[in-house]
Amino acid sequence: MVRISGVDLPRNKRIQIGLTSIFGIGNTSADKILTTANLSPDIRCSDLTDEQVSSLRTIIDESYQTEGDLRRVYSLNIKRLTEIGSAAGRRHRVNLPVRGQRTRTNARTRKGKVKTAVAKKKGR
């Protein structure tokens, strides 16, 4: 089992796809990492030698922000936006879409389940 940046890479997948399971590394970053390490993207994760794994670890640790560090940066950025009271921060605070999407219809993922209005009783 190959473990890089605290993530177990899937054994049966190609190393290029396996690297994308690390938060902060996508297809382009995986290509750059493999080029720097002189590895073929077609190698399976289970076929990597200890030497190759250690070279991948050093490249990722030196050049990329991944996993917990990157998640912390994201959350601090959102916290900063809410504290300064920017438009984006206000949208984050009330759980609405931040980047100008419509909300009259749709936006259910961000807004949550539909809250139905309760009808008033007549005659009282």
Swiss-Prot record:
Compositional bias segments (type: Basic residues): 101-124
SUPFAM superfamilies assigned to the protein according to its UniProt record, in alphabetical order: S13-like H2TH domain
Region Disordered, residue ranges: 100-124
GO biological process, one term: translation
Keyword RNA-binding: yes
GO molecular-function terms, A-Z: rRNA binding; structural constituent of ribosome
Localization per record: Plastid, Chloroplast
Coarse class of the protein's main subcellular location: plastid
Pfam families registered for this protein in UniProt: Ribosomal_S13
InterPro entries listed in its UniProt record: Rbsml_uS13_C, Ribosomal_uS13, Ribosomal_uS13-like_H2TH, Ribosomal_uS13_bac-type, Ribosomal_uS13_CS
Keyword terms of this UniProt record: Chloroplast, Plastid, Ribonucleoprotein, Ribosomal protein, RNA-binding, rRNA-binding
GO CC annotation terms, alphabetical: chloroplast; mitochondrion; small ribosomal subunit
Assembly information from the UniProt record: Part of the 30S ribosomal subunit.
Family label: Belongs to the universal ribosomal protein uS13 family.
Function: Located at the top of the head of the 30S subunit, it contacts several helices of the 16S rRNA.
PANTHER family: 30S RIBOSOMAL PROTEIN S13/40S RIBOSOMAL PROTEIN S18, SMALL RIBOSOMAL SUBUNIT PROTEIN US13M
HAMAP family, sorted: Ribosomal_uS13
Name this polypeptide is given: Small ribosomal subunit protein uS13c
Lineage, uppermost ranks: Eukaryota, Haptista, Haptophyta, Prymnesiophyceae, Isochrysidales
Gene name of the encoded protein: rps13
